[in-house]
Design a protein with these regions (language model features):
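N-terminal accessory segment detector
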Residues: 1-102, 109-127, 138, 142-159, ...
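Long, well-ordered alpha-helical scaffolding segments within enzyme catalytic domains
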Residues: 127-133
């Protein structure tokens, strides 16, 4: 392996680790809402997250992936196949006709990783489908397009699956997502599945897109939870989730980032690499064993129009949890700020 290949592989490990951390945060946040606020509130939160993502990303994504000239049912299903494949999600696509195309997420489910799936109510999983899949026809300007769900993993079935169907008539709101548990998807043939053009999707672009896929969920979830539950409750839920995930994931993330357990010195070095791996610029100064980290803005949230200072609880919770995973008694403090573009000044130790 050449030096350039070595460096690329190291960068890829770091990006993958950042993706795993943000992926865990998003899944953990849903479970935190389930356990602290109940199923109904969790379902409303998940619905709002996926509806916002659908409204912001579906149509631009169709164009970016070269799917915008396909029939509506086929375009919608292929979008889910390709966009999720980029993020490392297990996904299958099966074409039947121009008016009927299947999408299937076989086990293990990406979003409900590991044992998390045992804590996800069916209503919360359905909210995801209501938020995104049921609204694709509306986005495409074709009110005849609906989604028929035939299986849900969280209900004990062997995957989440269903098909987009273009009916002969416009659908009412409650007809855009229906369930048909007596049906089953046809077999998946990878040889007939759509593929990304290699020229416009080279490996480095795919690697970065893999990282961004997971981070985008947190980018959406943080402002949504503030709008749904208010800044005080949202800050608590984001902070608690961050602490729990940070404590659980420090060793795993540190291994990929070249970090280790220790004291404030080791944790400051770890944070420097973490900032670099998520495209944030940070300057670190040390004085008598204490570190000040000046984070030059938060790139993930820089273009979020409804950013609220409570969103920063994502970082305060994560960093406190990661510090606890690194070693005992490593205090982490963030000086208050009020805008996504303002520098964040952290004190460590």
């Amino acid at each position: 392996m050449t030096g350039e290949q070595d460096a690329r592989e190291t960068q890829w490990r770091k990006w993958r680790s950042v993706a795993d951390l943000y992926h865990a945060f998003f899944t953990g946040l849903i479970l935190t809402v389930v356990t602290r606020r109940g199923t109904a509130d969790a379902a409303e939160f998940v619905f709002r997250v996926f509806r916002r993502q659908q409204q912001e990303r579906f149509l631009p994504g169709l164009k970016k992936l070269g799917l915008d000239s396909l029939p509506p049912a086929v375009a919608a299903a292929q979008y889910h196949y390709l966009s999720n494949w980029i993020g490392g999600v297990h996904v299958e696509y099966m074409y039947e006709t121009d008016r009927k195309a299947w999408i299937r997420y076989p086990p293990p489910r990406w979003i409900w990783k590991g044992t998390a799936i045992c804590g996800v109510p069916g209503e919360v999983s359905r909210a995801m489908l209501r938020g995104w899949h049921a609204n694709n026809g509306v986005a495409l300007g074709d009110l005849r397009l609906g989604f028929v769900c035939t299986k849900q993993s969280v209900d004990g079935q062997d995957g989440l699956e269903g098909y987009y169907c273009e009916y002969d008539h416009p659908l009412e709101l409650d007809q855009r997502l229906v369930f048909a548990r007596h049906l089953e998807a046809p077999p998946f043939d990878p040889n007939t599945a759509p593929a990304l053009p290699v020229d416009s999707w080279p490996k480095p672009r795919l690697e970065k897109a893999y990282r961004n896929y997971a981070m985008e969920y947190v980018k959406t979830a943080a402002p949504v939870i503030v709008q749904v539950f208010g800044p005080e409750d949202a800050s608590y839920l984001l902070h608690l989730t961050g602490r729990l995930i940070g404590m659980q994931y420090y060793d795993e993330v540190a291994q990929a980032l070249g970090g280790r357990r220790g004291r404030a010195t080791e944790f400051a070095a770890f944070l420097r690499t973490l900032f670099e791996s998520q495209d944030d610029i940070a300057d670190i100064t040390e004085s008598e064993g204490q570190f000040e980290i000046r984070q030059q803005g938060w790139k993930l949230m820089a273009d979020v129009a409804d950013y609220h200072p409570a969103c920063a609880s994502v970082l305060t919770g994560l960093f406190e949890g990661l510090a606890a995973g690194c070693g005992r008694r490593i205090p982490v403090h963030l000086k208050p700020n009020s805008a996504a573009g303002a520098p964040f000044v952290w004190s460590i130790g």
